Amino acid sequence: MGVVNLLSRSSFPSVDSYLALSVLVAIVASVTVFTTFRSQPELQKLIEEELRNNTRLSSAYGLNIEALSGHTFFQIAHYILSDTTLIWVAINSYFAILAVCTRLIIKLTFKELARQEENVARQAFFCYVLLTIVYLSVVIGPQKGHRVMPWMIWGGICAFLSHLQFITCQRLKHISPSCDRGSQKISFLSLFLFFVSIAMTFLISRFQHHLTWQPAVLLYFDCLLAVFRSTYILFRCISSSRVFSFNPDSVRHFNYWLELITNFVCELIQMLSFAQLLAFSPGLNLTSIFFLYHMKLTYNCMTEQLSRHRNHKKIFEHIERSYPSVKCANGDDRCVVCWELLGTSRRLPCSHQFHDWCLMWWLAQDSSCPTCRCTIPSPQDQIRQPPEVGNSTRLRFNGGSFGFVHFPAFTLEVAANFGPFFGRAAEPTEEQLQTMLEQVREMFPQMSVDIIMTDLRQSGSAQSTIENILEGRIGMNASFMPGGVLDDELSDESENEIEYEEPAEIVQEPDNGRQRTWTKLSSSSGDEDLSYYEIQRAKMIETYRRKYLESDKAADLRAMGITE
């Protein structure tokens, strides 16, 4: 969606500017209405007579018009709803109130959103707004004007719920059973979303006799989506609590199946909703193409989820078959993927241990050990097939004559992919870039989003960006740091965190204006007294020091005779 990507990347319209403009318009409209009522007393009597003669409100909703027609508030509401301009001001004020409530709830629950979460939420919100506009063009098209406002109110409630649900689902991906302090607010928010979804369903069941069956089915589709998503959030909060932290493998298994079933059911409901809108749209027009396109998107999402599930199943079977399940000897050791206590884990050939599900998610992205980057066999190597090159369509014309003109026979071959012809591959879309960005951020949360996105646009692959980070070509790296900062930091880390039985070898530079001292691993150090993490950290420090000394920035050190 080019329009959605353009709006989501631009700084306008921002929420602050929209709220300021809405407050200004609401103040001007309120002053105008109250001035009109004060300057024209006969207007109140006219509206009162009009309300008493309006039998539609009393018959449809059972309101006591005789008692309500004398109240000034009810008269002002009727005056606003009867005016074409003021009714849109009222609807816009309603949307502004929902936006303020959404921001307050997000502020109280999550405090501040990450930049990536804000961008993804902004793009999802604009997608929902575009879908709602097309949705209303089909639903409200053949109906009268007084039916517009209920549909707009319903669309605002659905947008309010879907935005909170989307942000909560994004945050729940990073919730761990170890952090129970921040998850309490998310639990209260999940209960609020669940009860609002149930209230929406109850409200539609009460007023469905005022609607025909086609709009009622569409409203029930919205209710089902809200209920399924709220139920998913509620169960995720329950499973992430400390009550079930004693069995993390069962919790991960439950969360995986819960997310898979919820996503599949929600995509199916959305596809059925688009199919109904396509069936009852007024003729074949652009909206029909729009609904067909989104039906194809939802179908592709469902097939991708099933394909991803089959791949995960193969990887999990490979893990259970190839790597033994062991009990961690040290109760304080943690998995380097999720940073939870190891407990029962899987041991790789390089002797590193990880949880079953952590190892499965890792092998789905990379066929190497998360700690030492040692290559390990994975079924993903067989699943990943190189893209077929050379797919083409061949058109054959046998020739012929038209009057006195003779056309020779020729063959036209059209290639399916013009990327190699122009010397470059197809650039990834924004959706693919966001997916790859999430994969890289799961492994390197400390990295800046801008740095990762810049490298992804150049490499076009999450695997290439991960290798660039690990090999030090981007990010906070030794080869990009000044010499003084690097030496001082490595000296502090070596002296504070690594202790050896024997004295460490101290290397000093000659007296040429500066003097540096750093700690180096001794060949006779007692590694048995150090933890595995400390040993690997010391090796990593030596590796990066060696890389720095081999770089161009260390030419002055090599000239002094310092080569290791």
Curated annotation (Swiss-Prot):
<keyword id="KW-0325">Glycoprotein</keyword>
<keyword id="KW-0472">Membrane</keyword>
<feature type="transmembrane region" description="Helical">
    <location>
        <begin position="86"/>
        <end position="106"/>
    </location>
</feature>
<keyword id="KW-0812">Transmembrane</keyword>
<dbReference type="GO" id="GO:0008270">
    <property type="term" value="F:zinc ion binding"/>
</dbReference>
<dbReference type="GO" id="GO:0005783">
    <property type="term" value="C:endoplasmic reticulum"/>
</dbReference>
<feature type="zinc finger region" description="RING-type; atypical">
    <location>
        <begin position="335"/>
        <end position="373"/>
    </location>
</feature>
<dbReference type="InterPro" id="IPR013083">
    <property type="entry name" value="Znf_RING/FYVE/PHD"/>
</dbReference>
<keyword id="KW-0863">Zinc-finger</keyword>
<feature type="transmembrane region" description="Helical">
    <location>
        <begin position="123"/>
        <end position="143"/>
    </location>
</feature>
<dbReference type="InterPro" id="IPR001841">
    <property type="entry name" value="Znf_RING"/>
</dbReference>
<keyword id="KW-1133">Transmembrane helix</keyword>
<feature type="glycosylation site" description="N-linked (GlcNAc...) asparagine">
    <location>
        <position position="53"/>
    </location>
</feature>
<dbReference type="InterPro" id="IPR003892">
    <property type="entry name" value="CUE"/>
</dbReference>
<protein>
    <recommendedName>
        <fullName>E3 ubiquitin-protein ligase hrd-like protein 1</fullName>
    </recommendedName>
</protein>
<feature type="transmembrane region" description="Helical">
    <location>
        <begin position="215"/>
        <end position="235"/>
    </location>
</feature>
<dbReference type="Pfam" id="PF02845">
    <property type="entry name" value="CUE"/>
</dbReference>
<dbReference type="GO" id="GO:0043130">
    <property type="term" value="F:ubiquitin binding"/>
</dbReference>
<dbReference type="GO" id="GO:0005829">
    <property type="term" value="C:cytosol"/>
</dbReference>
<feature type="transmembrane region" description="Helical">
    <location>
        <begin position="148"/>
        <end position="168"/>
    </location>
</feature>
<dbReference type="Pfam" id="PF13639">
    <property type="entry name" value="zf-RING_2"/>
</dbReference>
<feature type="transmembrane region" description="Helical">
    <location>
        <begin position="272"/>
        <end position="292"/>
    </location>
</feature>
<keyword id="KW-0862">Zinc</keyword>
<comment type="function">
    <text>Proposed to have a role in neuroprotection.</text>
</comment>
<feature type="transmembrane region" description="Helical">
    <location>
        <begin position="17"/>
        <end position="37"/>
    </location>
</feature>
<dbReference type="GO" id="GO:0061630">
    <property type="term" value="F:ubiquitin protein ligase activity"/>
</dbReference>
<dbReference type="GO" id="GO:0035264">
    <property type="term" value="P:multicellular organism growth"/>
</dbReference>
<dbReference type="GO" id="GO:0030968">
    <property type="term" value="P:endoplasmic reticulum unfolded protein response"/>
</dbReference>
<dbReference type="GO" id="GO:0006511">
    <property type="term" value="P:ubiquitin-dependent protein catabolic process"/>
</dbReference>
<feature type="transmembrane region" description="Helical">
    <location>
        <begin position="61"/>
        <end position="81"/>
    </location>
</feature>
<feature type="domain" description="CUE">
    <location>
        <begin position="432"/>
        <end position="474"/>
    </location>
</feature>
<dbReference type="GO" id="GO:0000151">
    <property type="term" value="C:ubiquitin ligase complex"/>
</dbReference>
<dbReference type="GO" id="GO:0070936">
    <property type="term" value="P:protein K48-linked ubiquitination"/>
</dbReference>
<feature type="transmembrane region" description="Helical">
    <location>
        <begin position="185"/>
        <end position="205"/>
    </location>
</feature>
<dbReference type="GO" id="GO:0016020">
    <property type="term" value="C:membrane"/>
</dbReference>
<keyword id="KW-0479">Metal-binding</keyword>
